[in-house]
Structures are given as C-alpha cells and as structure tokens.
Amino acid sequence: KEEERKKEEERRKEEERKGRKEQNKQMTFLMGAFFTGLALIFFILIFQFNSVSKPAIIMLAIFLSLIGVFGGIVITGSAFVIMMTMMGIIALAGIVVNNGVVLLDYAQLLIDRKKHEKGLGKNQYLEKSDLFESIVTAGKARLRPVLLTAITTILGLIPLAIGLNINFFTLFGEFDANIYFGGDNVIFWGPLAWTVIYGLIVATFLTLIIVPILFFLITTFKMWLRHKMKPNMQTELIH
C-alpha cells in the first residue's frame, strides 16, 4: 500500500509538471501573439495618423485597460485561465484601438477645421483655448458611439459569460427553449467573455477621459517645445 501511494504521488506530480509545462508553452505563444499584434497595430496607426504621439496614446490605453481585466479577476476571485483570458485580452485590444481611433481622428478633424478658419498652416498650432474646445467637442460628439460599442459588446457577451444555454431546435420544433445556465460552455468561454467585459468597462472610461487629456497634454507640450526652440533658432540665424 505504501508503494502504491508513492507511485500515485509520483504520477500526480508528473502530471502537474506536464500541465505547468503546457501552460508555459501556451503563455509564451499568446504573449508573443499579443505583442506582435500590438506592434502591427502601432505601425498601421503611425501611417494612418502620420504621427507617433496619437498611436502611443492608444497603445497606452490598451495597457491601462489591463487594470480592468486583472482588477476584475482579483475582485471576483475568478480563475486566470491562460488560454482564454489571453485571447480575451487580444480581442479587447482591438476594441480599445477602434474607440481610440474614432475619438482622436475626429478631434484632429475639428482641429484642422479650426486651423483653416483661422488661416493657420498645417504645421502651426492653435491657441490652448481653441485646442481645448476642439477636443471637448470631439469627446461630446463621440460619446454616444463609444458608449454604444461598450454597451452592445458587454450585453452580447453576458449570455456567454453566465453560461446561458437555449436549445433552438426544441424552441422551434416543440416550443420549448430548454433554457438552463452553466454547462461545459461557460467553463471554456466564460473566462474570455469576462475578460473582455472587465477590460471594456475600464477601457470606455479611459477612451472618454484619459485619451483626450493625454492628447491635450502632449499637444500642449509640443507647442511649448516649439516655442522654446524658436528663439534659439532665431539666435543662431543672427549669429
């Protein structure tokens, strides 16, 4: 009996080692896919905006949205399922990028219109008050699309997250939906759905508040930097 118990323990330890090894492989692959995807998104956004600052703001919003993911997992005490949670994070990154692009692109459009009205060149900057007004107007105009994206995505994922099952064959054939909660589906798909839900709640706040603030601060810093460099350039020309 003692030998059998030892063999059972060794077999269990071996299975645990294999499980950990497989998890590490999955984690390595998904982390590589995540950062490769982010790099591709970043370069595409650079060509889209013809700027580095706006893509950098959107990338920062993606990383900050992870606060919502891990915060939600910790608060609810959910299990961190490597495969599905990482897939949820990758899906979340796409939504965050979409919302950020919608907001910043419209803000830049309003800024360009304001420049045209004031007769400013493409490389010139607006006054702080005009810049602030354009960004606030863009935030108000894009409030509804960003909120609707978040609400519809969250509502669409809730049945998957709670494991709502409906048998459509019996619903149309016998008028009995056979509705029940749980099952194998929620074990597999639940972590992915909750990951996107947790992250999207925080990401929506980031898109509407943090992203415009960062855009304003970075543009203001560029204005200050150009103002600082201009006298130096004039001094060099005089000498």
Residue map of PLM features:
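Extracytoplasmic/periplasmic membrane-proximal domains and adjacent transmembrane bundles
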Residues: 1-4, 8-37, 46-49, 114-133
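Short beta-alpha junctions and helix-cap segments that line functional grooves
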Residues: 26-30, 54-55, 71, 183
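Hydrophobic transmembrane alpha-helices and their membrane-interface caps
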Residues: 40-142, 148-166, 172, 198, ...
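Interfacial helix-loop-helix hairpins and adjacent transmembrane helices
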Residues: 112-133, 165-187, 213-239
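Structured binding elements
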Residues: 188, 192
